[in-house]
Amino acid sequence: LFRGKEGYCNTVQHAGVIIDHKDDMPHHIFGNFAEHDPVTNIARDYLAVTGASLMIKKDLFNAIKGFDTDYWVEFQDVDICFKVKAAGYRVRYTPYSVAYHDEGGTRGRTVSAEIREHDAGLLLNRWGKQADDMYLWRDRAYGLPDLRGVKADVR
């Protein structure tokens, strides 16, 4: 998923969601990386992906009762991904699906502390602490090799 505003069109907004070991909250990974950065061009499973570009079979969506309207603004996408995983399915990021997204374009750019606290509290109360994505921590201090010097296979 690429940023939709002019000047940002060649930078990644989202290539999966991780649970950061520092605050136990979901975060986009690889934000602001270059479009063809090798680490953003690997299909892989995650705990969650963004709702800004999410595909799910209708039958599964209905079976897990879709998005939860108890969330005010944030984390509905993470919640639905957790429900998908709890139902025994994988949550997969693929670099082969490309979209441009103007984050906050309809709801506004900022989220109040009250909204964030409500939605984060709901997510944590409902799902508890999720396992860290062991190889995908935001500070990159663990696991993933630095692949920036590796050329992508663009056949």
Identify what each model region corresponds to.
Residues 120, 127-154:
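C-terminal accessory regions of radical SAM enzymes
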Residues 96, 109-134:
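Catalytic core of nucleotide-sugar-dependent glycosyltransferases
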Residues 73-74:
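A short, glycine-/small-residue-rich helix N-cap motif at loop->alpha-helix starts
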Residues 1-64, 78, 87, 98-117, ...:
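Acidic/His-rich active-site region of diverse nucleotide-sugar glycosyltransferases
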Residues 90:
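Residue-level detector of anion-binding/catalytic polar loops
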